[in-house]
Structures are given as structure tokens and as C-alpha cells.
Amino acid sequence: MVTRITGLASGMDIDDIVSKLMQTERAPLDKLTQKKQTLEWQRDSYREVNSKIKELQDYMSKNTLTYPSTYQSKTVTSSNESVLTATGSVSAPNSSSTVEVASLATAATYKANNYTGYTQGDYNLAFNVVAPGETTAKTVNISVTSADTIDNVISKLNSSDLGVSAFKDKIWNGTEYVETIAFSSKATGAGGSIQAADSATADFMSGQLGFSLDADNKLTAYKEGTNAKVTINGFEMEKLTNNFTVNGVTYSIKNTTAATGPVTTSVSTDVDGIYNQIKEFVDKYNELVDSLNEKLKEEKYRDYTPLTSEQKEAMSDKEVELWEEKAKSGLLRNDSSISTGTNQMRTDFYTQVNADGKTYQLTEFGITTSSAYQLRGHLEINEEKLKAKIAEDPQGVANLFTSGTNDSNYSDKGIMKRITNTLRSTVKSIEAKAGNSTMGASSYSIGKNLNSISTEITDMQDRLNTIENRYYSKFSAMDSAIQKMNEQASYLSQLLVQ
């Protein structure tokens, strides 16, 4: 309100009088402003709920519990991990195997035997490279310029598709340490070769780098690459690398068994790993449902309405904080969207799942609802019972959680698909009321109400300005009349004195 200089003749504090008169006039505006604030708080509270729901949605989108293969996860133990370790894919059968390692796979090495120094120049090198275990050669081209030193050449060899790790150092030749260039193949296994594809390349490799080549211009290996030789359950086999897969089990061999004897590996369902994933999901679900139940039961303090600016000025910051905490409480109490969502999620968990001609009930797997009323919908796990089910029937656990498709009948859908759909529909229901950060206010119900109230507030402020101006006009007229009366009285007094 603008301060106006009035009441000079009457001596009255007209600003104060008008201010008090306007307090009554402004009461409806304060009600509208409070209503607007309440709606804004409610909108924000709804959006906080959706943020929590989306946290679970994000978790589920990244979690592998939605995939049937998760429930077929395997764990593999080795009786001697200093010799070999192993992991199992879902295709690995639960079984035990005896493994003997006769030799490890090694990489071929190449050593120059006549390196006397490098002469810089322009060289276009071409090689035919056969990887261990392959029969088809791959062509590799390397361009060397006159600006390249021997270190640059070695760097280019290493970064090319030649498949070697090259270096230059002093190496013992039997009598002394001699500066030498050497290659080590990046791939283990027998049968690989590096061939100079033309005479210029052959001359470079022998003349500049000092390597020996055979009649076919292939580099002569210092040590040939070898295959790993293993025996699994009596079956002898050779492998190109020390990491290989047999019957769904991937072995990583580190040493031979000559000194230690055979190693036993055991493949079994990864009960602990599967259980921990289910428990983590249940914990995340419980966090959400507990939060939603808290909103549904939150106390509503009807005597605590949003504060006006005048009320805030009369209170300390702490008093305002405590007041608004109660004013915001209970804004979503018994909300239909939230209660529908929580009720449906309980139904999703406890309605039996039909799959493979069988029916599956959550309680059969050791997962039940808490008996505490205040924790309605909160899930509890009987660890022993669930682990036993995972061990004896992992496919049944997979069916319970992942059965069906998005187009399946409700009874044929697993729990993860049901919960996914319920979370999605709950978010949409809440967004219809409170929108989201990307939606315009006219796209959701609270936003429409806020727009309407904002229009009412603007109109009412215009009316109040008109009323205030009218009050000032009346008091100004009264003050002018008093001033005239005072002037007339003064004139009469002067006449009487004469």
C-alpha cells in the first residue's frame, strides 16, 4: 500500500484508518493466496512421490531380475585356485569335473639376431599375418617416414594390426648383452606367422631390424607359440589360450597340475547371488511402499493454514519453519492415486502366477507381508525358505518373477512385469493431478486450479486497489470540507474580534 499525505486539516491518521479498513477487505484475498500456496505444496508433494516411484523404476530397468537367465546363474568352485579358476554361464549343468593341465598356452616370440643400427628413411611395409588357429592371412600395411627414429618405428609396429608387442633393449646372447629388437605375439597358441608381403619389406626386416626370415619370407620365431593341453573328465584337448570355455564353464588356467595333481571344479546354482538380488529388490520396494504408506497416514493439521506475509513478519524463522511443517503435513492423506497404487502392488505380489502349466504363489517361496498393520504391504523374506527354493527349483523362481510378456493375461504375468505396469500407471495418475517439470500448468488438474486462482487473485487485487482509492477519495473530500470549515471559523473569529 502506498503511503499518502492526507489528514492535514482533520489531524486524523488516514493511512492507518484506511489500512485497518482494508484488512477486512483483504481477507478473501488472503484466503485465495493461502489456497494457492496449499495447492503448490500439494503439487510438490505429489512430485516427490513420483520421484521416489521413478527411483524404483530406474532400479528395475537396470536390474537383471527381469531376465529369466538371472535365476539360472551359476557359481563354480575350484579345489586349487593357484592352478585354475572357473566361472559358469547359465548353460553350464550343475556338475563336478576333474581337470588336468599338462601345459599352458604360450605366445610366439621373435628376436633379431643381427641388429646393427637403424637407417632412417621412407619405407612402405606390407605383411601377411596369420593369427594362431587361423588359416587366412590378414594384410597389414605400415608407413615409415624419414623423420621416424627406431623408437618411432617400434611404436608404429605396436600400434598396428601386426599383433605384436615390440621393444628394443639389451638382451643376453649367451656371451654378452647386445642391443636387440624383439617381438612377442599378443595372442597365445600355435600356428601363427608373420610374413613379409614383398621384397622391400623383407629387406627392411632383415637389413634394418636384423630379423631372420625363411624361404617364404616368414619371420623365424625365437620360440614358437604353443597350445594349452588339458584333460577334462578324461578327454584330452588343446586350446589356443589359457582362458577357454567347455560345456558352459569358462576356465582360466595359471599353472600345470604336474606337481599338485588334478583339480576338481564344481558347478552349482548361484543361490547366494540370486537371493541377494531378490533381497535387494524387496528392500527397494519396501523403501517405496513404506514412504507411500507414510504419506497416506500423515496427520492433517487443519488449524495450520499457510501463513500470510504479515503473520510471517510477526514470527521468528524457526516458528515459521515449524508452522509450515505442520501446514504441509497430510496434504496427500488417503490420496486415491497413491492408495490405488499400493493396493495394486500388493495384489501384484499375492496373485498367483500361471506358467508352464503350474501355479506359483509368493508365500511358497518364503516371501510374506509383515503382520504389523502400520507396515501394510511391507514384504518380509524367510531367507532359509527362499534359498532352498532357489536351489531346488530356480526355473520356478524365474517363472514367479518373469513369466509372460506385456501382452499376456494378468495371471500369466510374472511379478516384475506386474509391478512395472503398476508403477507406470501410478506415475501417470499422479501426473494427471500434479504434472511434472516438463508439463505446462494447463495439462494437469492442480495446474489448472492454480491458473484459475492466479486469475482470481489478480482480479481481486484490482478490485481492492479500486476500493482503497475510493476510501482515500472520501477521506480526502472530508479533509477538504474540514479545512473549509476551519477557514470559515477563522474568518468569523476575526470579524467578532473587530
Curated annotation (Swiss-Prot):
Coiled coil location: 448-471
Q: Where in the cell is it found?
A: Secreted; Bacterial flagellum
Primary role: Required for the morphogenesis and for the elongation of the flagellar filament by facilitating polymerization of the flagellin monomers at the tip of growing filament. Forms a capping structure, which prevents flagellin subunits (transported through the central channel of the flagellum) from leaking out without polymerization at the distal end.
Q: What do we know about how this protein assembles, alone or with others?
A: Homopentamer.
Give the GO terms filed under biological process for this record. bacterial-type flagellum-dependent cell motility; cell adhesion
* InterPro entries the UniProt entry points to: Flagellin_hook_IN_motif, FliD, FliD_C, FliD_N
Per the record, GO CC terms? bacterial-type flagellum filament cap; bacterial-type flagellum hook; extracellular region
Which controlled-vocabulary keywords does the entry list?
Answer: Bacterial flagellum, Coiled coil, Secreted
The highest taxon in the source lineage is Bacteria
Q: Which gene encodes it?
A: fliD
Cross-referenced Pfam families: Flagellin_IN, FliD_C, FliD_N
Q: What is the lineage of its organism?
A: Bacteria, Bacillati, Bacillota, Bacilli, Bacillales
Q: Which PANTHER family match?
A: FLAGELLAR CAP/ASSEMBLY PROTEIN FLID (PTHR30288), FLAGELLAR HOOK-ASSOCIATED PROTEIN 2 (PTHR30288:SF0)
Q: What is this protein called?
A: Flagellar hook-associated protein 2
Which protein family is it in? Answer: Belongs to the FliD family.
